[in-house]
């Protein structure tokens, strides 16, 4: 059975910064709980299309980005103190600068997994009535469990709630990490796209 999960987060940062943060694969382990000890095991990068040139020089962000066709294998511990690591092989299937990108699982814990990240400019009013430019970040997951009825039971009892907790954690980490984002040389590659 196919399941969906959706999450939204408004961030007081411009689309260019938010998208660049999520398009940089080095940030993925930083968005996962520390107890998972997530790490990138392998990566084969495909360059994204040329980055649009922002009118505002402050938004001309130089950072690595994983374009459509990028394949990555990450591994992580499925629960605290786990002696095993779970490999997850995924590919960026679709990529459009400052709009969206989607990744699909080729090998991993799910029978099917597609995760689309999308951004759009959205201004909000603060407590003082001032208009703040920002970005609405949307995550949409489509996934299927393995192991038939047993997998569906696990989804009902554990997995659905765990996905919600992981995305709540991601939102907290995103809010903490975005103010620290500085374009810098990648540790994965010296090539900046």
Locations of the language-model features?
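Hydrophobic ligand-binding cavity/cleft-lining segments
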Residues: 1-58, 193
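Short, surface-exposed coil-to-beta transition loops
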Residues: 4-6, 85-89, 111-116
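Generic structural detector for well-ordered beta-strands
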Residues: 8-12, 91, 118, 142
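Hydrophobic pocket/interface hotspot
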Residues: 18-22, 28, 72, 92, ...
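Short, highly charged C-terminal tails/helix-capping segments
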Residues: 40, 173-193
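Glycine-rich portal/gate segments that line the openings of hydrophobic small-molecule binding cavities
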Residues: 40-107, 126-127, 181-183
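Beta-strand/loop substructures that line and gate deep hydrophobic ligand-binding cavities in soluble
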Residues: 102-165
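Substrate/cofactor-recognition hotspot
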Residues: 170
């Amino acid at each position: 059975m196919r399941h969906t999960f959706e999450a939204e987060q408004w961030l007081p940062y411009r689309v260019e910064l938010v998208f660049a943060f999520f398009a940089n694969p080095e940030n993925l382990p930083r968005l996962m709980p520390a107890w998972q000890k997530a790490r990138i095991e392998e990566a084969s990068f495909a360059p994204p299309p040329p980055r649009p040139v922002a009118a505002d020089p402050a938004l001309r962000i130089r950072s690595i980005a994983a374009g459509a066709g990028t394949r990555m294998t990450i591994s992580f511990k499925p629960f605290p103190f786990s002696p095993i690591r779970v490999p997850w092989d995924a590919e960026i299937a679709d990529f459009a600068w400052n709009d969206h990108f989607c990744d699909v699982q080729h090998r991993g814990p799910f029978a099917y997994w597609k995760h689309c990240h999308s951004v759009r400019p959205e201004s909000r009013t603060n407590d003082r009535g001032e208009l703040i430019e920002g970005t609405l970040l949307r995550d949409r997951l489509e996934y299927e469990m393995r192991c038939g009825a047993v997998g569906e039971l696990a989804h009902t009892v554990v997995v659905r709630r765990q996905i919600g907790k992981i995305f709540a954690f991601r939102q907290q980490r995103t809010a903490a990490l975005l103010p620290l984002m500085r374009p810098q040389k990648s540790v994965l590659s010296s090539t900046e796209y």
